[in-house]
């Protein structure tokens, strides 16, 4: 799945790991 807005995905251990990104003053866990 592609991340929306500015939420980066870290690829580790062959699996997409969800990253907590600080955007617009709100923590978005996508």
Swiss-Prot record:
<dbReference type="GO" id="GO:0005576">
    <property type="term" value="C:extracellular region"/>
</dbReference>
<keyword id="KW-0964">Secreted</keyword>
<protein>
    <recommendedName>
        <fullName>Hainantoxin F7-28.42</fullName>
    </recommendedName>
</protein>
<dbReference type="GO" id="GO:0090729">
    <property type="term" value="F:toxin activity"/>
</dbReference>
<keyword id="KW-0800">Toxin</keyword>
């Amino acid at each position: 799945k592609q991340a929306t807005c500015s939420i980066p995905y870290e690829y580790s251990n062959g699996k997409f790991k969800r990253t907590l990104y600080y955007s617009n003053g709100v923590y978005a866990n996508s």
